[in-house]
């Protein structure tokens, strides 16, 4: 009986030790992912803030008669100078009420194009939105680069739409941020619009950019709080991951760091197997010695 109790005690101690190792591995992953997503949040928020300030500067200039009275070269410099300092930014365009390009940050004589069909123009044309608008990721019509469009409208003295200022942030900028981080085998990094549209992802796949994941369990968790962690199975590749997420400042964007559960527990699986095997050997030895001792007494 004593040998049985001793072997059970050994088994209990090892089981507790194995479970403690699992908790430590999990808690360490949560802390690491939370720190990573906080760093991404700050970086993306800084980019968005600087870019929005540039757009607001163009809006203010377009409604300032003194700026609009300047010679063309000076006017372009006054309107677009700040945008040149924002990392990852493409061109900034000013569209008239019909969606035609009337001013262009990259060309003194604006390129001919119409964007009346784009969501970032139509939301202001219909009066459905005010303030900053973040569009769905698109391949820019003029540059051909995958970009995230961001726009603001300006109005005449009667409150009617006078035009839209739209600029783009190259998706390669976000990909560059993601590729600097190591989330292990099976890990993923995602930037979403608040409505569930995928803006950028690591590992990179152009096919999924712009896809809406609204209504999926993962998206419902992301939208339920400003920040946090949860475990879930990804809608895109069905991999079970630990997610750490944050909403980006006051912008309609969410970023997450997702580490695969298998990657988090890989080291623990090995330790658990070794410790468990050793515990079984000790338990068997205790029972075996007890049996031998009993036989010698008999």
Regions found by a protein language model. Give the residues of each.
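Juxtamembrane extracytoplasmic/periplasmic/luminal helical "stalk" adjacent to the first N-terminal
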Residues: 6-70, 81-89
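Conserved small/polar residues in nucleotide/adenosyl-binding loops
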Residues: 295-298
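Extracytoplasmic/periplasmic ligand-binding sensor regions of membrane-associated signaling proteins
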Residues: 83-91, 97-181, 185-188, 233-235
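Short loop/turn elements at sensory-signaling interfaces that couple input to output
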Residues: 154-162, 248-252, 276, 280
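Amphipathic coiled-coil signal-relay and dimerization helices
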Residues: 95-106, 196-203, 243-245
């Amino acid at each position: 009986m004593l040998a049985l109790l001793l072997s059970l005690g050994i088994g209990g101690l090892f089981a507790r030790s194995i479970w403690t190792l699992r908790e430590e591995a999990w808690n360490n992953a949560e802390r690491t992912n939370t720190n990573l997503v906080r760093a991404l949040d700050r970086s993306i928020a800084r980019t968005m803030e600087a870019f929005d300030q540039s757009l607001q500067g163009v809006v203010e200039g377009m409604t300032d008669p003194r700026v609009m009275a300047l010679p063309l070269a000076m006017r372009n410099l006054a309107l677009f100078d700040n945008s040149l300092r924002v990392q990852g930014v493409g061109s900034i365009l000013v569209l008239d009420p019909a969606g035609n390009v009337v001013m262009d940050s990259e060309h003194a004589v604006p390129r001919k194009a119409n964007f009346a069909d784009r969501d970032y123009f139509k939301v202001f044309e219909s009066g459905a939105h005010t303030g900053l608008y973040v569009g769905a990721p698109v391949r820019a019509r003029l540059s051909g680069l995958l970009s995230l469009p961001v726009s603001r409208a300006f109005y005449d003295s009667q409150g009617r739409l006078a035009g839209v200022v739209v600029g783009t942030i190259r998706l390669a900028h976000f990909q560059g941020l993601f590729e600097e981080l190591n989330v292990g085998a099976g890990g993923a990094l995602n930037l979403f619009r608040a409505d569930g549209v995928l803006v950028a992802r690591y590992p990179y796949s152009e096919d999924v950019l712009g896809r809406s994941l609204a209504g999926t369990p993962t998206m419902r968790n992301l939208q339920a709080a400003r920040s946090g962690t949860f475990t879930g199975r990804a809608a895109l590749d069905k991999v079970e991951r630990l997610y750490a997420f944050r909403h980006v400042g006051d912008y309609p964007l969410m970023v997450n760091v997702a580490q695969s559960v298998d990657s988090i527990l890989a080291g623990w699986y090995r330790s658990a197997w070794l410790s468990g095997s050793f515990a079984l050997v000790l338990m068997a030895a205790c029972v075996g010695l007890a049996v031998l001792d009993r036989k010698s007494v008999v």
